[in-house]
Amino acid sequence: MFPKDEFRKYAMGHQGISSLNLDRFENATAQSFTNSLTPYVIEERQMNVSVLDVFSRLMMDRILFLGTDVNYQVSNILQAQLLFLESVDPKRDIQMFINSPGGSVIDGMGIYDTMQYVSPDVGTICTGMAASMGAVLLAAGAAKKRSALPHSRVMIHQLSGGMRGTFSDMEISYNFSKQLREELYNILAKHTGKTFEQIEKDSDRDNWMRAKEAKKYGLIDEVLERNAGKDNA
């Protein structure tokens, strides 16, 4: 167990993340809820009572959330959280819940590389939607530890973007985007068992899958069903 301030000190001291960006991440996470409020939890311990936002409390149990668009702020915080949890215990698994429409590929690659780099297995769970870069991160979870809730949706598609400027600048942008697309398809091929050519074909347009279809495709390993014990309680 560790207090919320301990992570802030780690992120600011070891990862160079500013206090402002930490606050922005907390605000962005809070705004993903319809009431724009982050729930708080009262944590009672011997000789001490503290109040934590629910996401910080869940991180104490090694549960992380990607519940927004992928951008540089979210990427930096998630990378710092992964590295922090590795420093606390390099052998205990980490769970990452994903409900994201995707976003910046470059920033998403930072999260992906950190997931592969840290010692603990990072299990992934889709709740709601994992689209675009969100689908890549879902598939990037540890083998046999990738799952989705029954009514989740997963979507893969080709890289999107625009170009402007001089012809030389546009040529550079095109080559960069082409290289990035190949990296993404190779990552998906690695984690799904599909060929590069199959991924390229299936990603030509928005390719939406239900949870069971995502499992069949190799993006996840399990569809999490309702616990039968709850019905008998």
Regions found by a protein language model. Give the residues of each.
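Terminal-region recognition feature
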Residues: 1-233
